[in-house]
Amino acid sequence: AGIRRGIEKEGLRVLPTGGLALTPHPLALGSALTHPLITTDYSESQLELITGAHKGVQQCLDELTEVHQFVHHTLKDSGGELLWASSMPCGLPTDETIPLARYGSSNIGRAKSVYRMGLGHRYGRRMQTISGIHYNWSLPGVTSEQYFSLIRNFRRHAFVLLYLFGASPALCPCFVEGREHRLQRMEGGSALYLPHATSLRMGRLGYQSDAQATLAVSYNGLTGYANSLHEALTKPYPAYEALGIRNPGGDYNQLGTSLLQIENEF
């Protein structure tokens, strides 16, 4: 009793043919910078639908359904685009063709776009098109120490949860183009899969970072957690220093040269 929860659901806008829609964020969906319920994630083609905080599960799902239906009808009426249902992305163009989300010319809008430019340089734009659901929740009367105990337990059993509930066993060949993989081609189609895979999204081909794997983040308490992230946010990382903050033309490559540009990158 007393639990409050909210959902953030990401999804790619796609053409009826299954390819990524390269059109700007639809005007009919409002401003991606300021709309409280509908925004974009990494790409201009990647919608993020947001609910408020709810005490009841059904109320939360009902709001998400209403927002989802509004977006679906808006896309249908303004060009016939669809929302891709899977976590692993649809057919993608070349990496540099995937459009970054745009938020206008204000300082905060430009910072958000530069941050995404940095993500593209660091991890590749294709990886950033992986979509998912963020389930946000809070318990009444729970201390920071108790939250960290819960985090440690979740991380301890995460492999079992992915095995039981993972739902990304296949992907489009374009996602791993030019990369070494051991995936098999599905009979009668072009999709790649592994027979007993449950979550390619969370495997080595999915949403992973070798650079962040070097982070020694402490989950023993708030102070240790904050200190370990502070170092990642302030200490220069050689590979990102070599990339530089600006390119020769003066445009920004990234927000900074540390392992994490901002906290959200972790």
Locations of the language-model features?
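Loop-rich catalytic cores of soluble enzymes, especially ATP-dependent carboxylate-amine ligases
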Residues: 101-106, 110-122, 138-266
